[in-house]
């Protein structure tokens, strides 16, 4: 399968962040969390923009199906990659966090998306965005659109009504991502003192890192008994591309344009620890597999070992942030709501 270039979606977001760090400094009251907030706000804005483009791509495809699905598929990938910046968050504006399941239903342990989408397109209904909002979350988000574009059971290419269903789902998704962007228009952390912010910051990183780790550990399951259908984007075969984007975003959040945890540690004369964290990010990304499909990798022992190796690297990263960095900052990380589910 053609390699998905992460920089397409993530590069735009990080460029936007770099611009904001200088242009917004005179507009926003200075707070130790500002650099991280700018990243989050830019990521949310990028997600909303990419899903706006997804609506346009879907509408164009439905009008000219003979042009093929390539454009809408590429735009779906861009939208998915932009979502990786916010995926797994448990810190931030409540109005943004409450949209998570609407944007993406995962894990899907029982192929609920497949069953619900099959039932949806079989109904003799011209769906609108408002109608989709009243349906199960499994047919509302990125996974539902992936099913339409990639699943063998989808009749998208030969059924105009199914195509309009795709437009409706895309529009509803765009509305929800715009709500996320709106929620990130102001900094939710401005009232936190230094210790509270450090706790929130480390929790933000830990939550997203742990979510990314689950995207490997669930499909890996028990040694010798993988569950490839538990992979995040198994239909489009882009699970590993998504995960690389997760790690890239976590590194950007950790560094926060020179104003993040890395700078904090160095200011405390903990450069050795800071170097180890950065090195772990760098090694993880530099050795990330070219293969984009976790589903395909789990079909043989070599691929399983490769995926397990990536998980071990993320576990080391978690140890460094969750234990060593947190201890140096005097932060105690509490129970994570995603643990044990």
Question: Residue ranges of each PLM-predicted region?
Answer:
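Bacterial N-terminal signal peptides that target proteins for export
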Residues: 1-8
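Short, conserved catalytic or interaction motifs in soluble domains
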Residues: 21
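C-terminal motif of bacterial Sec signal peptides marking the signal peptidase cleavage site
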Residues: 15-18
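Mature extracytoplasmic or organellar-lumen-exposed domains after removal of signal/transit peptides
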Residues: 24-341
């Amino acid at each position: 399968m053609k390699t998905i270039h992460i920089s397409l979606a993530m590069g735009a977001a990080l460029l936007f962040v770099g611009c904001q760090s200088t242009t917004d400094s005179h507009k926003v009251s200075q707070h130790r969390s500002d650099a991280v907030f700018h990243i989050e706000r830019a990521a949310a804005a990028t997600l909303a923009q990419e899903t706006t483009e997804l609506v346009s791509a879907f509408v164009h495809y439905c009008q000219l199906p003979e042009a093929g699905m390539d454009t809408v598929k590429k735009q779906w990938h861009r939208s998915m990659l932009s979502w990786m910046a916010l995926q797994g968050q448990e810190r931030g504006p409540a109005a943004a966090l409450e949209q998570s399941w609407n944007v993406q239903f995962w894990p899907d342990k029982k192929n609920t998306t497949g069953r619900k989408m099959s039932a949806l397109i079989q109904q003799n209904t011209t769906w609108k965005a408002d109608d989709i909002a009243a349906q199960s979350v499994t047919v509302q988000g990125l996974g539902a659109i992936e099913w339409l574009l990639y699943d063998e059971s989808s009749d998208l290419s030969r059924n105009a009504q199914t195509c309009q269903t795709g437009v409706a789902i895309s529009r509803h998704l765009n509305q929800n991502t715009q709500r996320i962007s709106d929620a990130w228009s102001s900094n939710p952390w401005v009232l936190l003192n230094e210790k509270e912010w450090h706790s929130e910051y480390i929790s933000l990183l830990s939550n997203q890192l742990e979510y990314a780790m689950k995207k490997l550990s669930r499909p890996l399951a028990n040694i010798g008994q993988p569950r490839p259908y538990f992979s995040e984007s198994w239909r489009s075969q882009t699970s590993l591309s998504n995960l690389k984007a997760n790690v890239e975003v976590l590194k950007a959040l950790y560094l926060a344009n020179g104003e993040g945890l890395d700078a904090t540690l160095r200011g405390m004369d903990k450069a050795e620890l800071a170097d180890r964290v950065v090195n772990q990010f760098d090694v993880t990304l530099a050795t990330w597999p070219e293969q984009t499909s976790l589903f395909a990798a789990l079909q043989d022992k070599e691929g399983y070992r490769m995926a397990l190796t990536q998980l071990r690297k993320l576990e080391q990263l978690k140890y460094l942030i969750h234990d060593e960095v947190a201890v140096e900052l005097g932060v105690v990380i509490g129970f994570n709501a995603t643990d044990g589910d």
